[in-house]
Amino acid sequence: MKQNETFDQEREDLYHTFDEEDEESQTESSVPSTPLSRNRSEDVPVPWPRSYRQSMDLLTGVTPPTSTSFVSSFRQRRQSSVFGSFTSSPSKQQLLIDKDEIQSSVVSSIKSFLASHLQLSVPGDLLTPQENRSCTFSQSVLNGINVLCGVALLTMPYAVKEGGWLGLFILFSFGIITFYTGILLKRCLENSPGIHTYPDIGQAAFGTTGRILVSILLYVELYASCVEYIIMMSDNLSRMFPNTSLYINGFSLDSTQVFAITTTLIVLPTVWLKDLSLLSYLSAGGVISSILLALCLFWAGSVDGVGFHISGQALDITNIPVAIGIYGFGFGSHSVFPNIYSSMKEPSKFPTVLLISFAFCTLFYIAVAVCGFTMFGDAIQSQFTLNMPPHFTSSKIAVWTAVVTPMTKYALTITPVMLSLEELIPSSSRKMRSKGVSMLFRTILVLSTLVVALTVPFFATVAALIGSFIAMLIALIFPCLCYISIMKGRLTNFQIGICILIVIIGIVSGCCGTYSAIARLIGEMT
Protein backbone atom coordinates (compact mmCIF):
# COMPACT_ATOMS: atom_id res chain seq x y z
CA MET A 1 0.00 0.00 0.00
CA LYS A 2 2.87 2.34 0.87
CA GLN A 3 4.58 1.53 -2.42
CA ASN A 4 1.46 2.49 -4.38
CA GLU A 5 1.17 5.76 -2.46
CA THR A 6 4.81 6.56 -3.28
CA PHE A 7 4.22 5.76 -6.92
CA ASP A 8 1.10 7.95 -6.98
CA GLN A 9 3.01 10.83 -5.43
CA GLU A 10 5.82 10.53 -8.00
CA ARG A 11 3.33 10.53 -10.84
CA GLU A 12 1.52 13.55 -9.43
CA ASP A 13 4.83 15.38 -9.11
CA LEU A 14 5.71 14.37 -12.64
CA TYR A 15 2.56 15.78 -14.21
CA HIS A 16 1.95 18.75 -11.89
CA THR A 17 5.43 20.24 -11.82
CA PHE A 18 4.44 22.10 -14.96
CA ASP A 19 1.42 23.64 -13.25
CA GLU A 20 3.64 24.86 -10.42
CA GLU A 21 5.97 26.42 -12.98
CA ASP A 22 3.01 28.22 -14.54
CA GLU A 23 2.14 29.73 -11.17
CA GLU A 24 5.75 30.78 -10.64
CA SER A 25 5.90 32.39 -14.05
CA GLN A 26 2.84 34.50 -13.21
CA THR A 27 4.72 36.11 -10.31
CA GLU A 28 7.05 37.72 -12.84
CA SER A 29 4.36 40.10 -14.03
CA SER A 30 6.29 43.08 -12.72
CA VAL A 31 8.97 42.51 -15.34
CA PRO A 32 8.54 44.66 -18.45
CA SER A 33 7.03 42.55 -21.20
CA THR A 34 8.11 42.21 -24.78
CA PRO A 35 5.59 42.69 -27.60
CA LEU A 36 5.17 38.95 -27.82
CA SER A 37 4.82 38.47 -24.09
CA ARG A 38 1.82 40.80 -24.04
CA ASN A 39 -0.09 38.17 -26.04
CA ARG A 40 0.33 35.51 -23.41
CA SER A 41 -2.75 33.61 -22.30
CA GLU A 42 -2.82 32.96 -18.59
CA ASP A 43 -5.67 30.46 -18.63
CA VAL A 44 -4.52 28.12 -21.41
CA PRO A 45 -3.73 24.62 -20.05
CA VAL A 46 -0.26 23.14 -20.31
CA PRO A 47 0.12 21.66 -23.82
CA TRP A 48 0.43 17.95 -24.49
CA PRO A 49 2.84 16.17 -24.53
CA ARG A 50 4.86 17.24 -21.50
CA SER A 51 7.12 14.18 -21.21
CA TYR A 52 8.49 14.24 -24.76
CA ARG A 53 11.98 15.62 -24.23
CA GLN A 54 12.97 13.48 -21.25
CA SER A 55 11.65 10.23 -22.71
CA MET A 56 13.29 10.89 -26.08
CA ASP A 57 16.59 11.64 -24.35
CA LEU A 58 16.54 8.08 -23.06
CA LEU A 59 15.79 6.74 -26.53
CA THR A 60 18.63 8.61 -28.19
CA GLY A 61 21.09 8.01 -25.38
CA VAL A 62 22.10 11.68 -25.48
CA THR A 63 21.98 12.05 -21.72
CA PRO A 64 21.80 8.63 -20.05
CA PRO A 65 20.18 9.04 -16.65
CA THR A 66 22.30 8.71 -13.53
CA SER A 67 19.46 8.63 -11.05
CA THR A 68 17.80 5.43 -9.94
CA SER A 69 14.44 6.36 -11.34
CA PHE A 70 13.40 7.85 -14.64
CA VAL A 71 10.47 9.54 -12.95
CA SER A 72 12.73 11.06 -10.32
CA SER A 73 15.19 12.22 -12.96
CA PHE A 74 12.38 13.78 -14.97
CA ARG A 75 10.99 15.53 -11.90
CA GLN A 76 14.38 16.93 -10.91
CA ARG A 77 14.98 18.31 -14.37
CA ARG A 78 11.61 19.99 -14.44
CA GLN A 79 11.94 21.48 -10.95
CA SER A 80 15.30 23.00 -11.85
CA SER A 81 13.62 25.23 -14.43
CA VAL A 82 12.26 27.81 -11.98
CA PHE A 83 11.97 30.45 -14.68
CA GLY A 84 9.56 28.42 -16.85
CA SER A 85 10.22 26.21 -19.83
CA PHE A 86 8.91 25.25 -23.20
CA THR A 87 6.20 23.04 -21.75
CA SER A 88 4.57 25.94 -19.97
CA SER A 89 4.15 27.82 -23.24
CA PRO A 90 1.06 26.43 -24.95
CA SER A 91 0.65 29.03 -27.64
CA LYS A 92 2.75 29.94 -30.64
CA GLN A 93 3.51 33.37 -29.21
CA GLN A 94 4.68 32.06 -25.86
CA LEU A 95 7.32 29.82 -27.44
CA LEU A 96 8.74 32.76 -29.36
CA ILE A 97 9.12 34.94 -26.25
CA ASP A 98 12.65 36.13 -25.60
CA LYS A 99 13.15 35.03 -22.01
CA ASP A 100 16.61 36.52 -21.59
CA GLU A 101 15.14 39.86 -20.43
CA ILE A 102 12.85 38.21 -17.88
CA GLN A 103 15.56 35.89 -16.61
CA SER A 104 18.11 38.70 -16.32
CA SER A 105 15.69 40.90 -14.38
CA VAL A 106 14.74 38.17 -11.92
CA VAL A 107 18.38 37.17 -11.37
CA SER A 108 19.34 40.80 -10.77
CA SER A 109 16.54 41.19 -8.21
CA ILE A 110 17.64 38.10 -6.31
CA LYS A 111 21.26 39.24 -6.31
CA SER A 112 20.26 42.68 -5.06
CA PHE A 113 18.17 41.23 -2.23
CA LEU A 114 20.95 38.89 -1.09
CA ALA A 115 23.55 41.64 -1.23
CA SER A 116 21.50 44.29 0.65
CA HIS A 117 19.78 42.15 3.28
CA LEU A 118 22.10 39.21 3.84
CA GLN A 119 25.43 40.71 2.75
CA LEU A 120 26.00 37.74 0.46
CA SER A 121 27.76 37.74 -2.87
CA VAL A 122 26.41 35.04 -5.17
CA PRO A 123 28.08 34.03 -8.45
CA GLY A 124 25.79 34.65 -11.39
CA ASP A 125 26.10 31.17 -12.80
CA LEU A 126 24.53 29.72 -9.67
CA LEU A 127 21.36 31.71 -10.22
CA THR A 128 21.07 31.14 -13.93
CA PRO A 129 19.23 27.99 -14.98
CA GLN A 130 21.58 25.75 -16.91
CA GLU A 131 20.54 23.42 -19.69
CA ASN A 132 21.74 19.86 -19.55
CA ARG A 133 24.41 20.20 -22.23
CA SER A 134 26.75 17.32 -21.47
CA CYS A 135 27.50 15.65 -24.81
CA THR A 136 30.84 16.14 -26.49
CA PHE A 137 31.25 16.39 -30.24
CA SER A 138 32.20 12.72 -30.63
CA GLN A 139 29.31 11.57 -28.45
CA SER A 140 26.90 13.66 -30.51
CA VAL A 141 28.21 12.11 -33.73
CA LEU A 142 27.72 8.61 -32.30
CA ASN A 143 24.21 9.54 -31.17
CA GLY A 144 23.41 10.89 -34.63
CA ILE A 145 24.66 7.75 -36.36
CA ASN A 146 22.88 5.58 -33.80
CA VAL A 147 19.45 7.10 -34.44
CA LEU A 148 19.92 7.22 -38.22
CA CYS A 149 21.39 3.80 -38.88
CA GLY A 150 18.72 1.51 -37.47
CA VAL A 151 16.71 -1.48 -38.61
CA ALA A 152 16.31 0.04 -42.09
CA LEU A 153 19.83 -1.22 -42.80
CA LEU A 154 18.56 -4.80 -43.08
CA THR A 155 16.16 -4.02 -45.91
CA MET A 156 18.39 -1.82 -48.10
CA PRO A 157 19.39 -4.68 -50.46
CA TYR A 158 15.68 -5.49 -50.88
CA ALA A 159 15.06 -1.87 -51.88
CA VAL A 160 17.59 -2.27 -54.71
CA LYS A 161 15.63 -5.26 -55.96
CA GLU A 162 12.40 -3.25 -55.88
CA GLY A 163 13.67 -0.04 -57.46
CA GLY A 164 16.66 -1.14 -59.50
CA TRP A 165 20.23 0.09 -59.40
CA LEU A 166 19.32 3.65 -60.33
CA GLY A 167 17.21 3.79 -57.20
CA LEU A 168 20.46 4.24 -55.27
CA PHE A 169 20.56 7.79 -56.64
CA ILE A 170 17.25 8.36 -54.84
CA LEU A 171 18.83 7.03 -51.64
CA PHE A 172 21.76 9.41 -52.06
CA SER A 173 19.42 12.32 -52.84
CA PHE A 174 17.35 11.62 -49.73
CA GLY A 175 20.56 11.72 -47.71
CA ILE A 176 21.33 15.22 -49.00
CA ILE A 177 17.77 16.52 -48.63
CA THR A 178 17.25 15.19 -45.11
CA PHE A 179 20.62 16.60 -44.07
CA TYR A 180 19.43 20.01 -45.24
CA THR A 181 16.10 19.70 -43.44
CA GLY A 182 18.02 18.76 -40.29
CA ILE A 183 19.85 22.07 -40.63
CA LEU A 184 16.47 23.81 -40.95
CA LEU A 185 15.37 22.29 -37.65
CA LYS A 186 18.55 23.61 -36.06
CA ARG A 187 17.76 27.12 -37.31
CA CYS A 188 14.28 26.85 -35.85
CA LEU A 189 15.75 25.84 -32.50
CA GLU A 190 18.10 28.82 -32.55
CA ASN A 191 15.24 31.23 -33.15
CA SER A 192 14.10 31.18 -29.52
CA PRO A 193 15.52 29.86 -26.22
CA GLY A 194 12.10 28.34 -25.49
CA ILE A 195 12.27 25.82 -28.35
CA HIS A 196 13.92 22.52 -27.48
CA THR A 197 12.06 19.67 -29.22
CA TYR A 198 10.30 18.89 -32.49
CA PRO A 199 6.83 19.43 -30.94
CA ASP A 200 8.07 22.82 -29.74
CA ILE A 201 8.99 23.68 -33.32
CA GLY A 202 5.54 22.64 -34.49
CA GLN A 203 3.97 24.81 -31.79
CA ALA A 204 6.15 27.81 -32.60
CA ALA A 205 5.18 27.51 -36.26
CA PHE A 206 1.49 26.61 -36.11
CA GLY A 207 0.39 26.97 -32.50
CA THR A 208 -0.99 24.23 -30.29
CA THR A 209 -2.52 22.46 -33.30
CA GLY A 210 0.93 22.15 -34.86
CA ARG A 211 2.37 20.79 -31.63
CA ILE A 212 -0.32 18.13 -31.29
CA LEU A 213 -0.16 17.10 -34.96
CA VAL A 214 3.62 16.76 -34.92
CA SER A 215 3.52 14.85 -31.64
CA ILE A 216 0.92 12.38 -32.91
CA LEU A 217 3.00 11.65 -36.01
CA LEU A 218 6.14 11.14 -33.94
CA TYR A 219 4.38 8.78 -31.56
CA VAL A 220 2.81 6.82 -34.42
CA GLU A 221 6.29 6.41 -35.88
CA LEU A 222 7.62 5.11 -32.56
CA TYR A 223 4.70 2.71 -32.21
CA ALA A 224 5.20 1.44 -35.77
CA SER A 225 8.90 0.95 -35.06
CA CYS A 226 8.00 -1.33 -32.15
CA VAL A 227 5.83 -3.35 -34.53
CA GLU A 228 8.83 -3.62 -36.86
CA TYR A 229 10.98 -4.82 -33.96
CA ILE A 230 8.63 -7.71 -33.27
CA ILE A 231 8.45 -8.66 -36.95
CA MET A 232 12.22 -8.45 -37.22
CA MET A 233 12.87 -10.63 -34.16
CA SER A 234 10.29 -13.25 -35.12
CA ASP A 235 11.51 -13.48 -38.73
CA ASN A 236 15.13 -14.01 -37.74
CA LEU A 237 14.37 -16.52 -34.99
CA SER A 238 12.10 -18.51 -37.30
CA ARG A 239 14.96 -18.54 -39.79
CA MET A 240 17.19 -20.14 -37.16
CA PHE A 241 14.51 -22.54 -35.92
CA PRO A 242 12.19 -23.12 -38.92
CA ASN A 243 10.56 -26.28 -37.61
CA THR A 244 9.13 -24.68 -34.49
CA SER A 245 5.35 -24.87 -34.18
CA LEU A 246 2.68 -24.90 -31.52
CA TYR A 247 -0.81 -26.38 -31.30
CA ILE A 248 -3.23 -25.05 -28.67
CA ASN A 249 -6.90 -26.13 -28.54
CA GLY A 250 -7.06 -26.66 -32.27
CA PHE A 251 -5.12 -23.50 -33.13
CA SER A 252 -1.93 -23.96 -35.09
CA LEU A 253 0.91 -21.44 -34.80
CA ASP A 254 3.83 -21.51 -37.20
CA SER A 255 7.39 -20.60 -36.23
CA THR A 256 7.00 -16.90 -37.07
CA GLN A 257 3.90 -16.56 -34.90
CA VAL A 258 5.43 -18.55 -32.04
CA PHE A 259 8.52 -16.37 -31.94
CA ALA A 260 6.50 -13.17 -32.28
CA ILE A 261 4.62 -14.12 -29.12
CA THR A 262 7.80 -15.30 -27.40
CA THR A 263 9.78 -12.13 -28.07
CA THR A 264 6.85 -9.99 -26.96
CA LEU A 265 6.71 -11.84 -23.64
CA ILE A 266 10.47 -11.33 -23.28
CA VAL A 267 10.36 -7.56 -23.81
CA LEU A 268 7.17 -7.07 -21.79
CA PRO A 269 8.86 -6.92 -18.34
CA THR A 270 11.25 -4.24 -19.62
CA VAL A 271 8.39 -1.78 -20.16
CA TRP A 272 7.42 -2.12 -16.49
CA LEU A 273 10.83 -0.89 -15.33
CA LYS A 274 11.10 2.53 -13.72
CA ASP A 275 14.86 2.71 -14.33
CA LEU A 276 15.66 2.42 -18.04
CA SER A 277 19.25 3.64 -17.75
CA LEU A 278 20.79 0.23 -18.47
CA LEU A 279 18.69 -0.20 -21.60
CA SER A 280 19.66 3.32 -22.64
CA TYR A 281 23.35 2.46 -22.45
CA LEU A 282 22.84 -0.83 -24.31
CA SER A 283 20.77 0.87 -26.99
CA ALA A 284 23.58 3.38 -27.52
CA GLY A 285 25.60 0.43 -28.87
CA GLY A 286 23.40 0.35 -31.96
CA VAL A 287 26.27 1.70 -34.07
CA ILE A 288 28.36 -1.34 -33.16
CA SER A 289 25.44 -3.64 -34.00
CA SER A 290 25.01 -2.06 -37.43
CA ILE A 291 28.71 -2.34 -38.23
CA LEU A 292 28.74 -5.94 -37.00
CA LEU A 293 25.81 -6.82 -39.27
CA ALA A 294 27.58 -5.29 -42.27
CA LEU A 295 30.83 -7.11 -41.48
CA CYS A 296 28.99 -10.44 -41.17
CA LEU A 297 27.33 -9.84 -44.55
CA PHE A 298 30.65 -9.01 -46.23
CA TRP A 299 32.34 -11.98 -44.54
CA ALA A 300 29.68 -14.37 -45.81
CA GLY A 301 30.14 -13.08 -49.35
CA SER A 302 33.92 -12.92 -49.48
CA VAL A 303 35.20 -15.55 -47.05
CA ASP A 304 32.37 -18.07 -46.65
CA GLY A 305 32.01 -18.38 -50.42
CA VAL A 306 28.59 -16.93 -51.19
CA GLY A 307 30.22 -14.63 -53.74
CA PHE A 308 29.15 -11.46 -55.53
CA HIS A 309 27.29 -11.43 -58.85
CA ILE A 310 25.98 -8.41 -60.74
CA SER A 311 22.31 -8.83 -61.68
CA GLY A 312 18.99 -7.00 -61.52
CA GLN A 313 17.33 -4.18 -63.43
CA ALA A 314 18.64 -0.68 -63.93
CA LEU A 315 15.25 0.79 -62.99
CA ASP A 316 11.94 -0.81 -62.03
CA ILE A 317 9.30 1.87 -62.56
CA THR A 318 6.50 -0.31 -61.21
CA ASN A 319 8.06 -0.95 -57.82
CA ILE A 320 10.17 2.19 -57.39
CA PRO A 321 7.57 3.80 -55.04
CA VAL A 322 8.11 0.95 -52.56
CA ALA A 323 11.86 1.49 -52.75
CA ILE A 324 11.33 5.21 -52.16
CA GLY A 325 9.39 4.41 -48.99
CA ILE A 326 12.15 2.11 -47.73
CA TYR A 327 14.81 4.72 -48.43
CA GLY A 328 12.71 7.31 -46.63
CA PHE A 329 12.39 4.94 -43.68
CA GLY A 330 16.17 5.01 -43.38
CA PHE A 331 16.27 8.79 -42.93
CA GLY A 332 13.23 9.41 -40.73
CA SER A 333 15.05 10.23 -37.48
CA HIS A 334 14.42 13.97 -37.37
CA SER A 335 12.25 13.58 -34.28
CA VAL A 336 15.36 13.25 -32.10
CA PHE A 337 17.72 15.75 -33.77
CA PRO A 338 16.49 18.62 -31.56
CA ASN A 339 17.27 16.49 -28.50
CA ILE A 340 20.81 15.88 -29.75
CA TYR A 341 21.24 19.59 -30.45
CA SER A 342 19.96 20.58 -27.01
CA SER A 343 22.35 18.13 -25.32
CA MET A 344 25.55 19.34 -27.00
CA LYS A 345 28.22 21.26 -25.12
CA GLU A 346 28.98 23.12 -28.35
CA PRO A 347 25.71 23.51 -30.29
CA SER A 348 27.52 25.50 -32.97
CA LYS A 349 29.06 22.23 -34.15
CA PHE A 350 25.69 20.60 -34.74
CA PRO A 351 25.84 21.07 -38.56
CA THR A 352 29.15 19.18 -38.58
CA VAL A 353 27.59 16.45 -36.46
CA LEU A 354 24.75 16.14 -38.97
CA LEU A 355 27.16 16.17 -41.91
CA ILE A 356 29.28 13.34 -40.51
CA SER A 357 26.25 11.32 -39.41
CA PHE A 358 24.41 11.62 -42.73
CA ALA A 359 27.54 11.07 -44.82
CA PHE A 360 28.43 7.93 -42.88
CA CYS A 361 24.92 6.48 -42.91
CA THR A 362 24.25 7.28 -46.58
CA LEU A 363 27.48 5.63 -47.74
CA PHE A 364 26.91 2.78 -45.28
CA TYR A 365 23.40 2.18 -46.63
CA ILE A 366 24.70 2.17 -50.21
CA ALA A 367 27.54 -0.23 -49.37
CA VAL A 368 25.23 -2.70 -47.62
CA ALA A 369 22.63 -2.40 -50.39
CA VAL A 370 25.19 -3.16 -53.10
CA CYS A 371 26.85 -5.94 -51.13
CA GLY A 372 23.60 -7.68 -50.20
CA PHE A 373 21.99 -7.49 -53.62
CA THR A 374 25.10 -8.67 -55.50
CA MET A 375 25.27 -11.63 -53.12
CA PHE A 376 21.67 -12.83 -53.38
CA GLY A 377 20.24 -11.06 -56.44
CA ASP A 378 16.50 -11.26 -57.01
CA ALA A 379 16.26 -13.90 -54.27
CA ILE A 380 16.95 -11.25 -51.65
CA GLN A 381 14.35 -11.17 -48.88
CA SER A 382 13.02 -8.28 -46.82
CA GLN A 383 15.99 -8.63 -44.43
CA PHE A 384 19.35 -9.78 -45.76
CA THR A 385 19.92 -11.88 -42.63
CA LEU A 386 17.14 -14.19 -43.85
CA ASN A 387 19.22 -15.03 -46.95
CA MET A 388 22.47 -15.79 -45.16
CA PRO A 389 23.20 -19.56 -44.99
CA PRO A 390 22.30 -20.60 -41.43
CA HIS A 391 25.26 -22.97 -41.02
CA PHE A 392 27.86 -20.19 -41.27
CA THR A 393 29.14 -18.66 -38.05
CA SER A 394 28.88 -15.20 -39.60
CA SER A 395 25.21 -15.86 -40.32
CA LYS A 396 24.51 -16.91 -36.75
CA ILE A 397 26.22 -13.81 -35.39
CA ALA A 398 24.22 -11.60 -37.76
CA VAL A 399 20.90 -13.23 -36.90
CA TRP A 400 21.41 -13.05 -33.15
CA THR A 401 22.54 -9.43 -33.47
CA ALA A 402 19.32 -8.71 -35.38
CA VAL A 403 17.37 -10.32 -32.53
CA VAL A 404 19.12 -8.85 -29.48
CA THR A 405 19.37 -5.26 -30.75
CA PRO A 406 15.60 -4.59 -30.98
CA MET A 407 15.14 -6.26 -27.60
CA THR A 408 17.23 -3.51 -26.01
CA LYS A 409 15.44 -0.78 -27.95
CA TYR A 410 11.82 -1.86 -27.58
CA ALA A 411 11.12 -0.45 -24.11
CA LEU A 412 12.96 2.80 -24.87
CA THR A 413 10.96 3.22 -28.07
CA ILE A 414 7.54 2.51 -26.59
CA THR A 415 8.11 4.51 -23.37
CA PRO A 416 7.52 7.97 -24.95
CA VAL A 417 4.22 6.67 -26.33
CA MET A 418 3.17 5.26 -22.97
CA LEU A 419 4.05 8.41 -21.04
CA SER A 420 2.21 10.62 -23.50
CA LEU A 421 -0.94 8.51 -23.20
CA GLU A 422 -0.69 8.39 -19.41
CA GLU A 423 -0.65 12.19 -19.41
CA LEU A 424 -4.22 12.08 -20.72
CA ILE A 425 -5.44 10.32 -17.57
CA PRO A 426 -7.28 12.85 -15.35
CA SER A 427 -5.08 13.98 -12.46
CA SER A 428 -8.04 13.69 -10.08
CA SER A 429 -8.33 9.93 -10.65
CA ARG A 430 -5.88 8.38 -8.18
CA LYS A 431 -7.05 4.85 -8.97
CA MET A 432 -6.28 5.31 -12.66
CA ARG A 433 -2.82 6.58 -11.73
CA SER A 434 -1.91 3.63 -9.50
CA LYS A 435 1.07 1.42 -10.25
CA GLY A 436 -1.10 -1.59 -11.05
CA VAL A 437 -3.22 0.30 -13.56
CA SER A 438 -0.08 1.71 -15.15
CA MET A 439 1.41 -1.77 -15.59
CA LEU A 440 -1.88 -3.04 -17.04
CA PHE A 441 -2.04 -0.11 -19.44
CA ARG A 442 1.53 -0.69 -20.61
CA THR A 443 0.89 -4.40 -21.03
CA ILE A 444 -2.13 -3.72 -23.24
CA LEU A 445 -0.09 -1.31 -25.36
CA VAL A 446 2.70 -3.88 -25.85
CA LEU A 447 0.22 -6.62 -26.70
CA SER A 448 -1.37 -4.32 -29.26
CA THR A 449 1.96 -4.10 -31.11
CA LEU A 450 2.00 -7.91 -31.13
CA VAL A 451 -1.48 -8.03 -32.65
CA VAL A 452 -0.45 -5.59 -35.39
CA ALA A 453 2.74 -7.55 -36.06
CA LEU A 454 0.79 -10.80 -36.39
CA THR A 455 -1.75 -9.11 -38.66
CA VAL A 456 0.79 -7.53 -41.02
CA PRO A 457 4.02 -9.56 -40.66
CA PHE A 458 5.65 -8.00 -43.71
CA PHE A 459 8.80 -6.18 -42.66
CA ALA A 460 9.70 -4.42 -45.92
CA THR A 461 6.14 -3.37 -46.76
CA VAL A 462 5.53 -1.93 -43.29
CA ALA A 463 8.89 -0.13 -43.54
CA ALA A 464 7.87 1.31 -46.91
CA LEU A 465 4.56 2.50 -45.45
CA ILE A 466 6.27 4.17 -42.48
CA GLY A 467 8.85 5.77 -44.76
CA SER A 468 6.33 6.99 -47.30
CA PHE A 469 3.68 8.36 -44.98
CA ILE A 470 5.37 9.36 -41.72
CA ALA A 471 9.03 9.88 -42.62
CA MET A 472 8.19 12.12 -45.58
CA LEU A 473 6.14 14.34 -43.28
CA ILE A 474 8.64 14.38 -40.43
CA ALA A 475 11.88 14.55 -42.43
CA LEU A 476 10.91 16.56 -45.53
CA ILE A 477 7.59 18.39 -45.37
CA PHE A 478 7.24 19.66 -41.79
CA PRO A 479 10.82 20.96 -41.36
CA CYS A 480 10.38 23.18 -44.43
CA LEU A 481 6.89 24.39 -43.52
CA CYS A 482 7.90 25.12 -39.92
CA TYR A 483 11.03 26.93 -41.08
CA ILE A 484 9.06 29.14 -43.47
CA SER A 485 6.48 29.93 -40.78
CA ILE A 486 8.93 30.66 -37.96
CA MET A 487 11.35 32.67 -40.11
CA LYS A 488 8.57 34.54 -41.90
CA GLY A 489 9.82 37.77 -43.45
CA ARG A 490 13.49 36.89 -42.96
CA LEU A 491 14.03 34.44 -45.83
CA THR A 492 15.17 35.11 -49.37
CA ASN A 493 13.14 33.97 -52.36
CA PHE A 494 15.81 31.35 -53.05
CA GLN A 495 15.48 29.86 -49.56
CA ILE A 496 11.70 29.79 -49.84
CA GLY A 497 11.96 28.21 -53.28
CA ILE A 498 14.23 25.43 -52.00
CA CYS A 499 11.82 24.70 -49.16
CA ILE A 500 8.83 24.61 -51.50
CA LEU A 501 10.70 22.25 -53.85
CA ILE A 502 11.48 19.88 -50.97
CA VAL A 503 7.85 19.99 -49.84
CA ILE A 504 6.73 19.06 -53.36
CA ILE A 505 9.24 16.19 -53.47
CA GLY A 506 7.97 14.99 -50.09
CA ILE A 507 4.32 15.17 -51.10
CA VAL A 508 4.83 13.36 -54.42
CA SER A 509 7.08 10.69 -52.90
CA GLY A 510 4.79 10.26 -49.91
CA CYS A 511 1.61 9.89 -51.96
CA CYS A 512 3.11 7.46 -54.47
CA GLY A 513 4.90 5.43 -51.83
CA THR A 514 1.94 5.26 -49.47
CA TYR A 515 -0.42 4.14 -52.22
CA SER A 516 2.00 1.45 -53.42
CA ALA A 517 2.73 0.22 -49.90
CA ILE A 518 -0.95 -0.03 -48.97
CA ALA A 519 -1.75 -1.80 -52.26
CA ARG A 520 1.03 -4.30 -51.68
CA LEU A 521 0.01 -4.78 -48.06
CA ILE A 522 -3.53 -5.64 -49.13
CA GLY A 523 -2.18 -8.03 -51.75
CA GLU A 524 0.07 -9.81 -49.23
CA MET A 525 -2.74 -10.16 -46.71
CA THR A 526 -5.19 -11.69 -49.19
Swiss-Prot record:
Q: Which UniProt keywords apply?
A: Amino-acid transport, Membrane, Transmembrane, Transmembrane helix, Transport
Source species: Arabidopsis thaliana
UniProt similarity note: Belongs to the amino acid/polyamine transporter 2 family. Amino acid/auxin permease (AAAP) (TC 2.A.18.5) subfamily.
Q: Identify this protein by name.
A: Amino acid transporter AVT1E
GO biological process entries: amino acid transport
GO CC terms in record: organelle membrane
Q: Which InterPro entries did the record assign?
A: AA_transpt_TM (IPR013057)
Question: Where is it mainly found?
Answer: membrane
Q: Where is the composition biased (Basic and acidic residues)?
A: 8-18
Subcellular location field? Membrane
Its transmembrane ranges are 140-160, 165-185, 212-232, 253-273, 278-298, 320-340, 353-373, 397-417, 436-456, 458-478, 494-514
The membrane topology term of the UniProt record is: Multi-pass membrane protein
> Its encoding gene is what?
AVT1E
Q: Where is this region: Disordered?
A: 1-49
